[in-house]
A protein has these predicted regions:
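Flexible glycine-/small-residue-rich
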Residues: 14, 66, 152
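Short, charge-patterned binding micro-sites
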Residues: 47-58
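Structured alpha/beta or helical-core interaction and ligand-binding surfaces enriched in interleaved
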Residues: 61
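Long, charge-dense
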Residues: 75-119
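Short, hydrophobic/π-rich interface segment
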Residues: 109-162
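Glycine-rich, aromatic-bearing surface loops/beta-hairpins
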Residues: 142-192
């Protein structure tokens, strides 16, 4: 998959209309809806970026990258339905000529306590209580990366953070597939 597959983008700015709901809450809802739309289209050619990200926040803007056709299918699916009061969407725009590229990927903590407990329970036939006693929450190492709190459309897992890692800027695109979240550990998205 070449850069031509990511020739267009949709920019979604998340708004915080009142004190009740934060920009990060809106971003979580937008990202969750996008995940559902990507999953329902069974596609791996849609990537995301967070151009206003900071050290600990993904920021208020989500860019969705893809071909004009892929983005049209996404919009036709109505993934921003009922979020219009909380977002400003650009519609489909061509990527500018002079851009850099970067990988926007999911990062996972190596020492997730729930994951280690499940493995311990499976391998040693322990109860959840025994596993919790052996592996307390305090062993977790927090990632110093921005995250989005989501619940999965494809599994019944409760809400969990997805940590977002922005790779170095590159002068050439790197092809590859994107996950159901629009993230990839190998493929790049246009960065501008």
């Amino acid at each position: 998959m070449g850069h031509s597959m990511l020739s267009h983008f949709i920019q979604v700015r998340c708004l915080s209309p009142d004190q009740e709901i934060t920009v990060q809450d809106i971003m979580s809802r937008v990202f969750y809806r996008l995940h559902g739309a990507i999953a329902s289209l069974h596609t791996s050619d849609v990537g995301v970026s967070f151009p206003n990200h900071t050290f600990m926040s993904v920021g208020d803007v989500l860019r969705v990258h893809g071909s004009k056709d892929a983005l049209t299918r996404l919009l036709d699916g109505g993934w921003l339905f009922r979020l219009e009061d909380y977002t400003l969407s650009s519609g489909i725009i061509s990527v500018p000529e002079q851009v850099k590229y970067r990988c926007v990927s999911r990062a996972r903590a190596k020492s997730s306590a729930p994951r280690l407990r499940r493995r311990l329970m499976r391998r040693h036939n322990l109860s959840e209580l025994e596993a919790k006693r052996l592996i307390p929450d305090s062993i977790e190492k927090r990632l110093n990366l921005p995250s989005i709190l989501v619940c999965s459309k494809t599994t019944s897992t409760p809400s969990y953070p997805i940590f977002i890692k922005h790779g170095p800027l590159l002068s050439s695109p790197v092809p590859g597939p994107f996950s159901g979240y629009g993230l990839s550990s190998e493929a790049t998205v246009p960065w501008f």
